[in-house]
């Protein structure tokens, strides 16, 4: 069945592709729109007119629009874009040819001072296209340049990019999957940055809901990039050392990365009050964590000609964990009150290797056909020992398991590019995962097998009418789960749609909807115990089925000078929700998972951002409701903000996040102070040398209390993160670019 399904999808995609290509048998005219510096003008409106009739109209993508004219003749070609002076020429067209239109930026004269017009962000069906300022392009740091975008929260020192709500977007370069390549980009090469807050069914399949697409200028001979970074806590706790490089010519490039991180002397204290029936265990203690992590990759890129691109990536990851804990307390029953001691130890490791191949072909009409294949091998093993001593009674418990994963993925996608009729994309993908789990505590050793299939085919269409933009994407998803106890197959729809209205005076109103499906994780399906608590077991459920997720978003944006204000609301609905529940067997609490009806989550909030040349700040407030099946709605507040002040070669940066509570189906967490309170001072010593010192948590000692309450059992666990609080770190990085304008863009997905 799976082979026939893939064949049908491949034939359908190929048929659509041949149909699109055959339509354009008339004369094609490639229109390049550039500014005075010969950089492409993104999203310029282009029209081709014959006499009094407009024969073609469209918007540039990467500075190019391909027009179709019915026959030879003299045509009037016009281009306009916000912030530029419109341009118009006449051209005699007799065969397929190229036209270059050069637009000049508008200037406003005020008392003999010339002020270049600020480029207004361009609204699309799914998001917004930003053009970076000249200051951002000349800053030399791509993360600092991206921080100019109002809806992004960028940590320049740690090289991370988040949305204002804390979600990490998928990073694309020139529309291609790309996750590890922001650092090598010279910001002077950035033509535009598109932030998509609604994605097509293709990206929903990957679990992505936000995209940051960085479009670059095209050039290329020899170039190189290298970077060394190191960061360490004081006193010693967490540290890292990393190096990356890229070197290449016009048609070939190689890049690589090696990173080492460590964690030492990390102490977290616990105050635990646990009751099971009439028995009570109260204890205080401390967990000491030790980890070592190694990861790296090697990436090869080859462009034999301007229309074909090949890349291959090889990655490796290993993570080792060594934890120890000791608790002292009292064990209380109706007749006894004895001292209680608890010792715990954990030795774990996980990691894997990945190899992937990517190919892309560009057609003459700027449409693209891309294919991708991946193999991933993963492993995880853990041995945990818990010993409880109560008077003369000693109770040891152990968890000892080993997991192996083989995962295969293939995909093919077609993108028509921007055309007069809009943009059409279609494609198909298949991911097959095989997991083996060994439970060494069981006698004989228990071996469990889990297989998951996730196949998908889709088509998307996007266009606009005046200031109204729309996108619709639909597909069908085949989900299969096979365990030792059960096997199920599910056909599910997958849908994404958006409607965006660009109102006068820099106002935008956007409504969006998506429906997607999610397979249960293997850890939720494997039916053996993974807890060392003798009163409380945790095990999976092999009979789970996929969750169906629906989301409705409504956003209103208003820009006023350097300010941007947003008011928003979001509603989520999870059908066949996989949630935790607890049952009692032989006076033991067993936490497992089940598909339990419907979960509903709703939030409303507002966000304000200010972006000036040397000062940037944002603040948001949000109220959330969570409603689990059979329970009443529970609400909580979420606040976050950030500020950055640049002065000379220095900048001061701070972030702040606070919430009062959070909920699951069986427990809730109370937060006693902010979840994040970070401040740092950075210094760009030279163009190559950068240093920063930070206090990752300055609000005292971060703490929270986790509470679980049910009939016959309760646990209250107060946690204090002692080592990660009030502990500064120092980061130093050295970066060297040579001919950075000539870098080949990475288009291989980073998994």
Give, region by region, the residue ranges found by the protein language model.
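Short acidic/polar hinge/loop motifs at secondary-structure boundaries
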Residues: 148, 176-202, 243-245
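N-terminal periplasmic "start-of-domain" segments of outer-membrane beta-barrel proteins
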Residues: 51, 61-62, 114-137, 160-171
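Extracytoplasmic beta-strand/coil segments of soluble accessory domains associated
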Residues: 143-177
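Transmembrane beta-barrel wall of Gram-negative outer-membrane proteins
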Residues: 236-264, 279-324, 351-364, 641
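Short, acidic, small-residue-rich periplasmic hinge/interaction motif at the N-terminus
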Residues: 47, 80-84, 98-135, 197
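Face-selective signature of the C-terminal outer-membrane beta-barrel domain
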Residues: 293-320, 344-486, 490-496, 502, ...
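Outer-membrane beta-barrel signature, preferentially recognizing the C-terminal barrel domain
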Residues: 507, 517-566, 573, 591-602, ...
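N-terminal periplasmic accessory domains that precede
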Residues: 98-102, 112, 116, 142-145, ...
